Regions:
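Surface-exposed binding/hinge segments that line
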Residues: 102, 121, 137-187
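Extracytoplasmic/periplasmic ligand-capture domains
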Residues: 2-3, 28-29, 40, 72-73, ...
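C-terminal segment of N-terminal export signals and the immediately downstream linker at the start
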Residues: 21-38
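N-terminal secretory signal peptides and thylakoid transit peptides that target proteins
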Residues: 1-14
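Mature extracytoplasmic/periplasmic domains
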Residues: 184-185, 324-344, 511-516
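N-terminal lobe/hinge region of extracytoplasmic solute-binding protein
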Residues: 37-94, 202-203
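Short, solvent-exposed loop/turn elements at domain surfaces
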Residues: 42-48, 75-78, 171-174, 218-219, ...
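Long beta-strand-rich cores associated with HINT superfamily self-processing modules
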Residues: 512-537
Length: 537
């Protein structure tokens, strides 16, 4: 069972969230979009948004821009990468480890300063140069996932920079969609202090931060001078509210205190529809697994245990529990994806086989396997973690596995993930329940299986250190033809499933419940969304 602390954490957001619903000033005189997020705090406002991918959705792609961004204009076609603050990028013909990025001209930060090559170098220094006055260890921990392949960089001219990778790496540019750029002039203005910058942020994005109060609300206003005139927001203001409790979010929408909620309560869908709300879903690149510790001596270092855990859960029943707000997962990507491959280990619900494998590993109903898992109360892509983990706990118990949960705030769980399974805290755990995006090759696979990504360098929390996986990761980075790359990635997913390095459960369909007053919304096949075309009223 979930601990009493879990229940307290789940309910702790209620009074806070309720207080945050006060209507914004002059709400009747201007168009305002009010959104209840699943996170427990306002994502960092300084261009290095925390709170996972939801942080990027609400405080990254709104206030800031990356060099390369996603086209989020379609609900039917997969999102694709397009030019952002960089208009063109290519490898040097004489040295494919060097990438040239030609930068967009005529772009201004919200403080009025000019975006140029110096701004790019400043943001790289922030993460990669510990001797720089701009260096920010907190921001680095967030942004390094986009920058880790880069071993060198330089300014070529006012609107051109060069990035160098350790080896040939054709995947690197796709990572830069998460590298949002802050203003060097504003950093100077606030006294070269990132804490002060967060109080007075400045990006180049379609929205400006008007005000924000930690753990309560942030108010954004549209940037009428945005460089892409087609993406100047149609709504004047957007209010972001951290509301991690799922029931509180649904109640807020039904009562008209917000216009949009992330992840409505599964049992509230009929009531929300009856109240005139729309339930928006779409297939997005996402997986919701247990990331397993492969530390020597851990029970999950035994492949028989790992396979048994994958066979112990009825995924169709979990989807039914969530009222259809999920899709079963038997690998990092859906089975019809070109990256899925052809694993020999077929993940299905087979409790008898799970018991057999556990018995071979020395466990059983009379000698139960005890495991400790770190989970969150809510968070970006975490869906309904308390409900879902209780379901898994019950199913595992039926095959002789007893789960104990360490329940954390989402940001605390992310910090635990970044520390790795070999950290003092990680050694007390058998797995972590962190949802992952699978939007690009690195995020879908390579950050988990590449030994170069063992913390603190990356997200290989379980400490997978396997020559075959390393070889496949290198091959993927050296492959430029998209169809050939698909084949390499399919081999990676095949090996991940055959080795059962995760316990896969479901893929999210990113449900949003939206007031009937909201128009113009496109629900893309992505973790991100373009709020610019949305209107209210």
């Amino acid at each position: 069972m979930l601990s009493r602390r879990s229940a307290l954490l789940a309910g702790a957001a209620l009074p806070l969230a309720s207080g945050a619903f006060a209507p914004p000033a002059q709400a009747q005189q201007s168009s305002v979009l009010r959104i209840a997020m699943t996170v427990a705090d306002i994502p960092a406002t300084d261009g290095a948004p925390d709170q996972g991918t939801e942080g990027i959705r609400f405080m990254g792609y709104t206030v800031y821009d990356p060099l390369i961004m996603w086209d989020l204009s379609s609900a039917t076609a997969p999102a694709k990468l397009v030019p952002g603050l960089a208009t063109k990028w290519y490898q040097q013909p004489t040295d494919p480890t060097r990438w040239v990025f030609e930068l967009r001209q005529g772009v201004k930060f919200h403080d009025g300063s000019t975006f140029n090559a110096d701004a790019v170098i400043f943001n790289l220094d922030r993460c990669l140069d510990e001797k720089s006055a701009a260096f920010d260890r907190v921001g680095r921990n967030v942004l390094i996932a986009a920058l880790w392949p880069i071993v060198g960089y330089k300014k070529i001219d006012e609107y051109k920079v060069e990035l160098q990778t350790k080896g040939v790496d054709t995947v690197m540019p796709s990572l830069l969609n998460r590298f949002t750029l802050a203003s060097p002039a504003n950093f100077e203005k606030v006294g070269k202090d990132w804490q002060a910058y967060r109080k007075s942020p400045s990006g180049t994005g379609p929205w400006k931060v008007k005000s924000w109060t930690p753990r309560e609300r942030a108010e954004l206003e549209r940037n009428t001078d945005y460089w892409n005139k087609d993406r100047i927001p149609k709504t004047e203001r957007m209010v972001l509210l951290p509301v991690p409790d799922v029931s509180t979010r649904s109640a807020a929408l039904l009562s008209g205190r917000v216009d949009w909620i992330e992840a409505p309560a599964p049992d509230s869908l009929d009531k929300l529809r009856a109240g005139g709300c729309k339930i928006e879903t779409n297939v997005i690149p996402h997986m919701w697994p247990y990331t397993l510790s492969l530390q020597p001596g851990a029970p999950t270092a035994d492949i028989r245990v790992r396979k048994a855990l994958n066979l112990a859960v009825d995924r169709d029943a979990m989807v039914k529990l969530l009222n259809g707000l999920a899709a079963p997962a038997v690998g990092c990507v859906p089975t019809d994806h070109p990256w899925f491959g052809n694993p020999s280990f077929k993940i299905k619900y087979d409790p008898a086989e799970a018991k057999k494998l556990l018995a071979e590993a020395g466990y059983g109903l009379q000698k139960r396997l005890k495991m400790k898992i770190a989970i969150s109360t809510a968070g970006s892509g975490q869906m309904y973690p308390l409900i879902m983990n209780e379901f898994i706990q019950q199913q595992f118990a039926e095959v002789g596995v007893d789960l104990e949960f360490q329940v954390l705030d989402w940001n605390a769980l992310l910090n635990l993930m970044r520390a790795g399974s070999k950290s003092p805290e990680g050694l007390q755990l058998n797995a972590i329940n962190v949802s992952w995006n699978t939007m690009d090759p690195h995020n879908a696979f390579m950050r988990f299986i590449d030994s170069q990504q063992i913390p603190p360098k990356g997200s290989n929390w379980g400490y997978i250190n396997d020559p075959e996986f390393d070889k496949l990761a290198t091959e993927a980075r050296n492959t430029s033809d998209p169809k050939d790359l698909d084949k390499v990635l399919a081999r990676i997913n095949t090996r991940m499933v055959d080795e059962a390095v995760f316990v896969w459960f479901v893929h999210d369909v990113w449900p949003n419940a939206i007031s009937g007053k909201v128009k113009g919304y496109v629900h893309p096949k992505s973790w991100y969304v373009d709020f610019s075309p949305v209107t209210v009223g």
